[in-house]
Amino acid sequence: MGIVVPTMKASVIEVLLVLLVTGIHSNKETPKKTKRPKLTVPQINCDVKAGKIINPEFMVKCPAGCQDPKYHVYGTGVYASYSSVCGAAIHSGVLDNSGGKILVRKVAGQSGYKGSYSNGVQSLSLPRWRESFIVAESKPQKGVAYPSTLTYSSSKTAAAKAGETTKAYEKPSIPGTTIQPVTLTQAQATPVAEVTHRSTSKPFAASVTNSPRPQPVGHRSQEMEEVDGWKPGPVLLDSGFVPKEELSTQSSEPVPQGDPNCKIDLSFLIDGSTSIGKRRFRIQKQFLADVVQALDIGPAGPLVGVVQYGDNPATQFNLKTHMNSQDLKTAIEKITQRGGLSNVGRAISFVTKTFFSKANGNRGGAPNVAVVMVDGWPTDKVEEVSRVARESGINVFFITVEGAAERDIQHVVEPGFASKAVCRTNGFYSFNVQSWLSLHKTVQPLVKRVCDTDRLACSKTCLNSADIGFVIDGSSSMGTSNFRTVLQFVANLSKEFEISDTDTRVGAVQYTYEQRLEFGFDKYNSKADILSAIRRVGYWSGGTSTGAAIQYALEQLFKKSKPNKRKVMIIITDGRSYDDVRIPAMAAYQKGVITYAIGIAWAAQDELEVMATHPAKDHSFFVDDFDNLYKIAPRIIQNICTEFNSQPRN
């Protein structure tokens, strides 16, 4: 019995070893059973655009030679789906011109695709497009199956020719979600009523399925939307779906850009009063349509909105409603007459307060223009509301048709209303048309004037229309620390202005017994460059010859000022001048230079008043300590603007 027990133990151990070896062998064989097949990456040509491919995420192989400029690319980083897929891949740096595999993912459309030159490809700008895409290196995500055959929106694909109208693949995996199979069906035309997002072009109804109920391709799951980096609006993968606020004209081509030489934001105020009658109202609409056609409307050129007035004004459509001439003409034709009085003043006030806003499509950098059409004369006053419009930067034009005859003057609420309303009373902004039948002759003259942006004087504001020259005391009494405080004061004033070559320009002179030009008006064209230049000014040290410094600034700085710029000199000193300041100050006045005199500590107030432009109380300032200098900056800016807004209108 003692021999049997060890034998049984040996048998048990032998069985356990066999089972262990068998299990290990079985585990080694398991991976072979679940090994994934090799990924097949479809190849595309250089000219294939992302918008032609329905799949929301896919891998493709690009051939060599896609760097050719004939393969257009729109955007930088995020590309409009009208772009060449392979061209965008080269531009982004994912590929070079030898070709290769890439990963493509569709994202929502956006506004403002910026062009740039990168990796031998010049991408173009585009105001907006309905769908975008991004490209990345071809590194498949774990657990994601990419389509081996692409589904196109056109029937000219291999899949369509072979009758393969449906391809199945899996959605990209998203953390926290379960991968669902997605089915894409070859695009077929469907009625607009069947589509959630309305489109004026023919939509196609490719279906995306992640549940038993089919959904349009234009819709993605909530999980997909949550991981999108760009979310300006609805996510639109279907190139047939376009929100109507994004594009008024649906086309497979980029939207018309408009005339870049006439970039204005224009509001037409049309007369819808009862007195104009139906026939003349139709003539007015035809005139408006002819002007719109001549302007060449587009996002890079002029934009037009229409306000109709009677008893009260109403916006027919704003600046961003229609982005090309043809759509505008169609919209104008549909305008119906309101009736009522001719309350022009109320309409101008309405436009000033509400029309030129960002929400209505105002672009900020484009001049604001209002063209007011009047049959006869207004039934309310226009002078005060027009003054507010001018001060708001609106260039008001008046077209008066069949104005008051001598016998009718007594009935006019405000005689000379047009001259009181327009931007300038120099004839440039007024049209007096004798008959509605001759109104068509005004089309070209009006277009020429509203597009002459250099003469749109009311676009100029106190912050964007001056040449400002600082004349800075660098004498020994200043000291290094106080001089830096003065430079900070100069920077604080400068940053309040809109600085560019066509807006406000800034220059600086430093003086002691001698003078030197730190930088002229044409040296720097941006606010950042100006502020940087001010910081770099070095302290000179020496005497105080303010009179000579004024004369030097007139000759070396303001002599190069532009004719249409307001010339403003700001003198900053901490002591009495060693030389006479009266004659140089008079010379500045005679040359049209507005002088502000800023005195600190030991500066002589009587001398400040001599140098300052009349009235001295508005143009001379004194602080007893350098640390209080910053306090007067807002008052100086306010006075500059008050003076600008009160300038003679001629």
Swiss-Prot record:
- Give the principal location in a single coarse category: secreted
Deletion phenotype, per the entry, is: Embryos show decreased spinal cord size associated with reduced cell proliferation and altered cell differentiation in the central canal of the neural tube.
Per UniProt, the keywords (alphabetical) are: Disulfide bond, Extracellular matrix, Glycoprotein, Neurogenesis, Repeat, Secreted, Signal
Induction per UniProt is: Highly up-regulated in the injured spinal cord.
- Cystine links in this protein are 46-62, 66-86
Q: Does the keyword Repeat apply?
A: yes
Localisation:
Secreted, Extracellular space, Extracellular matrix
State a GO cellular component annotated for this protein: extracellular region
PROSITE patterns linked to this entry: LCCL, VWFA
Q: Which residues form a coiled coil?
A: none
Q: Where is the VWFA domain?
A: 265-450, 467-640
The record's section on Gene3D superfamilies has: LCCL-like domain, von Willebrand factor, type A domain
GO biological process assignments: extracellular matrix organization; positive regulation of cell-substrate adhesion; spinal cord development
What SUPFAM superfamilies does this protein's entry cite?
Answer: LCCL domain, vWA-like
Q: Where is the signal peptide?
A: 1-26
Source organism, top-level taxon: Eukaryota
Enumerate the spans annotated as LCCL domain: 40-133
Residues bearing glycans: 492
**GO MF annotation list:** glycosaminoglycan binding
Subunit details:
Binds dermatan sulfate and chondroitin sulfate.
Known PANTHER family for this protein? COLLAGEN ALPHA, VITRIN
Q: What does this protein do?
A: Promotes matrix assembly and cell adhesiveness. Plays a role in spinal cord formation by regulating the proliferation and differentiation of neural stem cells.
> What protein name applies here?
Vitrin
Q: Which organism is it from?
A: Mus musculus
